[in-house]
C-alpha cells in the first residue's frame, strides 16, 4: 500500500510540481559482492549487493534525471525531476563494485572520505564479527559487564554464519538500550580503520578522473570535541583531500549521530570553503533548508530491492 501511495504521488501532477521544487539526495549504504553477506541479520540491511544496486539504478533512470550533487544543491530546476546519489564505501569497494554500474548507466555520484563512517553499532558489529581477540581486547573488556556469557558465543567463529549473526544482532539490540555516552565509549574501544594507503588514493584519483565520482569530506564518528574537530581533525582531513583530489566537493558530511553543525564547526567550514553540509536528518532539500544541515534519504537493502518503497520515502519527505 505504501509503495502504491508513493508511486501515485510520484506520477501525479501535484507530486511532479512539488518534486521539481525540491532536490532529492540518496545515501546508499556500502555495496558488497554477494547477497549472503548483505542479508546477514546483524547488518540490518545496511549493505546493498550489486544486483540490488543495479535494480535501484534502473528504476531511478525511469523516473529521474540523475545529476551531480553540486548541480542539485545550487538550486531547483523546474523542468525536470532531479536526484543525486551519495555512496558509502572505501576506495576499493567503490572502484570494484560501484563504479562499473555507474559507468554502465552513466549516472554520477559523490562519496565522502576522511573520518570513520561507522556508527557505534556498525563498529562494534564489525569488530566482533572479525573475531580477532587482540584487536578486540579493549572492546571485550567493556562488553563483559553488559553481556556476560553470551559474548563469547558471538565472538567465536563457527561454521554457521546465520546463527552467529542472529546472536550478534541480539547482543547489539541489547546494547541499543545503553545511554549515548556508553555507546560512544564502545565505539572508541573498537579498532580504528587503517588510513588510506597510496593504492587507495590512486583509486580515488582514477575514480575522480572518470568524471562520474567526486569526493567530499566526511566528519569523524564518534565526533571529537567541537574545538578539536573544527581546528585539528577537520583541517588535517581537508588538507589531505585537497592534496589528492583535483576538484573536491565544497560539501561536508557530518557523522550520522551528529544533529547539526555547532558554531565552532560552522566557522571552520566557512574558513575552509565548505558551502554545504549534510546532517543526520531524513528528507528532501529545498530553499528553506539550512545549507549546513541538509537532509538526505537513506536507502537500505530492502528499498534497493523494491524501489517502489523509495517512492513512499520521497512522498513522506515532500509533505509540508
Task: Report residues per predicted region.
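C-terminal active-site subregion of NodB/CE4 polysaccharide deacetylases
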Residues: 1-86, 93-95, 210, 220-320
Amino acid at each position: 500500500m505504501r509503495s502504491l501511495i508513493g508511486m501515485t504521488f510520484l506520477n501525479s501532477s501535484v507530486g511532479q510540481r512539488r518534486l521539481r521544487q525540491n532536490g532529492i539526495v540518496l545515501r546508499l549504504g556500502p555495496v558488497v559482492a554477494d547477497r549472503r553477506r548483505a542479508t546477514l541479520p546483524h547488518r540490518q540491511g545496511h549493505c546493498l549487493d550489486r544486483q540490488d544496486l543495479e535494480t535501484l539504478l534502473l528504476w531511478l533512470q525511469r523516473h529521474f534525471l540523475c545529476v551531480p550533487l553540486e548541480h542539485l544543491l545550487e538550486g531547483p530546476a523546474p523542468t525536470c525531476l532531479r536526484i543525486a546519489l551519495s555512496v558509502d564505501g572505501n576506495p576499493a569497494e567503490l572502484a570494484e563494485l560501484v563504479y562499473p554500474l555507474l559507468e554502465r548507466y552513466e549516472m554520477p555520484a559523490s562519496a565522502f572520505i576522511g573520518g570513520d563512517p561507522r556508527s557505534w553499532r556498525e563498529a562494534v558489529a564489525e569488530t566482533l564479527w572479525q573475531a580477532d581477540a587482540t584487536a578486540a581486547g579493549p572492546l571485550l573488556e567493556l562488553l563483559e559487564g553488559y553481556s556476560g556469557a553470551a559474548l563469547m558465543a558471538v565472538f567465536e567463529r563457527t561454521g554457521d554464519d546465520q546463527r552467529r549473526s542472529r546472536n550478534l544482532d541480539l547482543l547489539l539490540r541489547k546494547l541499543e538500550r545503553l545511554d549515548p555516552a556508553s555507546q560512544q565509549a564502545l565505539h572508541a574501544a573498537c579498532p580504528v580503520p587503517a588510513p588510506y594507503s597510496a593504492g587507495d588514493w590512486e583509486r580515488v584519483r582514477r575514480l575522480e578522473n572518470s568524471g562520474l565520482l567526486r569526493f567530499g569530506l566526511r566528519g569523524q564518528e564518534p565526533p571529537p570535541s567541537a574545538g578539536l574537530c573544527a581546528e585539528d581533525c577537520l583541517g588535517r582531513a581537508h588538507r589531505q583531500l585537497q592534496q589528492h583530489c583535483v576538484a573536491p566537493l565544497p560539501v561536508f558530511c557530518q557523522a550520522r549521530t551528529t544533529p547539526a553543525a555547532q558554531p565552532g564547526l560552522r566557522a571552520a567550514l566557512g574558513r575552509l570553503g565548505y558551502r554545504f553540509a549534510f546532517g543526520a536528518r531524513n528528507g528532501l532539500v529545498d530553499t528553506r533548508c539550512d545549507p549546513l544541515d541538509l537532509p538526505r534519504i537513506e536507502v537500505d537493502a530492502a528499498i534497493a530491492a523494491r524501489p517502489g518503497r523509495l517512492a513512499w520515502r520521497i512522498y513522506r519527505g515532500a509533505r509540508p
